[in-house]
Amino acid sequence: MPQIHRLSRADARRVAVLAQLLHGERPGGLLPAARRLTLLQLDPVSAVAPSADLVAWSRLGSSYVPGHLRAALDERRLIELRAMVRPAEDIALYRAEMAEWPGRGELTEWQRHRRDWVLANDRCRREILARLRDEGPLPSRRLPDTCDRPWSSTGWTDSKTQLLEFMVQRGEVAVAGRAGRDRLWDLAGRVYPDHPPVPTGEARRERDRRRLRALGLARPRGPEFPVEPADVGEAGEPALVEGVRGEWRVDPALLDVPFHGRTALLSPFDRLVHDRTRTQELFEYDYQLEMYKPAAKRRWGYYALPVLHGDRLVGKVDARADRKGGVLVVNAVHQDVPFTADLAAEVEREIADLAGWLGLEICRAA
């Protein structure tokens, strides 16, 4: 029987913070950070800054500039896969699964539906591949839109966009770059490194291992998340957390590591807080992204930034970058726990650092 590690909540929180590179020792650069975190999530909302850049700044500080991420993508050291920026070498962990799309063995009803829909639109799929072969990389608007069977959509996507998403999952096309906010599409073989695909079972176990290394502590099985799971299967070793029900898996390399915390402002999409259930269980922290709520129903703001202090999440900063006005508007600093004078000063320093990194002046909302 493997050893079951028994952790206090403080132990568990520190493992999570260490894993996410949010402790006192900053990583050596964007690529080492990306390899440890396994991904940087892209999101079109940039109320303060694009989320991937904000996550990198939280780890690297003001030595990081967004051009570093663009350069790494242009040089194919990082690759965009399904709105996640991943180390180029990690793509080999997905290629075998792509080749098996929509899955092996008996398919679920949803898998059959997706397979049949793509087959029904095979003419459009082939036309897209031919256009990319001859002219790529291309933005979506320059690709054929000749789907014979429309995608049943709630308004978030159209047929061509959905077909491109499935073609990504099939390993046929990939994002080759961006022109402004437009993704540029090309044949996957021109974008992905020519590394041998890792067999499916081995690749899933390795992805679980890397995910646990990035999270520090996670459930063996958990709720389903789109694109990137939050659970880790049998990776690591079993653990119990005092005051929290159920079993966890922990990366044993992070146990008994000296912890030196710091204060940090986080993206709402930061992996430390992305799994809201885990955040509540380990940090006893209540958080929701409220930009989709009517203004009158928001508790913390449109794009409130979680505040990490040591191994605790202690508040939220409601801020917005007004780039035309040249200011970072700070609407409120919400204190989940009463701030000491020292903590308040550290939070203000982080806000000042954020404004300086953005090249903006601080403006306090009336």
PLM regions: where:
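Long, charged, low-complexity, helical-prone intrinsically disordered regions
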Residues: 1-366
